[in-house]
Amino acid sequence: VDFIKRHIFPGSFIPSVAAMLAAKTRSSDLALVHLEDFGPSYARTLHDWRERFLARREDVRAQGFDERFLRMWTFYLAYCEGGFRERSIGVAHVLMAKPGYRGGSYLPGLLEA
């Protein structure tokens, strides 16, 4: 994560699901309505992005990006793909609701998927 925070998304904050839920419990009256872990399918997405990125590397160079940039993004995409495949990193959709929520979908289609 340090590589990602330093080189890919500087200044970002990447909390774990556990940290988000703990903060929710401490600081709000929100209720967890739905949580979907989609790390395994995101690994495939990252793989496809890396393949497309590498296939267009000449276009990337033509935009003025150097070899360091190409290596950094190739590494990032491969690193995250492996992390999601091995389940050492994760990504999730989290849906929370205020009190009074009665079960209707806030995001049509989300809970039916």
Range-by-range predicted roles:
Residues 1-103, 111-113:
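Substrate-binding/catalytic lobe of Class I Rossmann-like enzymes that use SAM or dcSAM, i.e.
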